[in-house]
Amino acid sequence: GIPCAESCVYIPCTVTALLGCSCSDKVCYN
């Protein structure tokens, strides 16, 4: 997928999750 410039190491994807991104290997991907 495409990296969404948000990490999810300590907290889940927040803003980018609204854009359809999900956590994968500590990084939010679309």
From Swiss-Prot:
One GO-annotated biological process of the protein: defense response
InterPro entries: Cyclotide, Cyclotide_bracelet_CS, Cyclotide_sf
PROSITE patterns recorded: CYCLOTIDE (PS51052), CYCLOTIDE_BRACELET (PS60008)
Residue location of crosslink Cyclopeptide (Gly-Asn): 1-30
Keyword Disulfide bond: yes
Protein modification: This is a cyclic peptide.
Superkingdom, natural source: Eukaryota
Disulfide bond positions: 4-21, 8-23, 13-28
Annotated tissue distribution: Detected in stems (at protein level).
Keyword Isomerase set for record: no
Domain characteristics, as noted in the entry: The presence of a 'disulfide through disulfide knot' structurally defines this protein as a knottin.
Family: Belongs to the cyclotide family. Bracelet subfamily.
Protein name (record): Cyclotide hyen-L
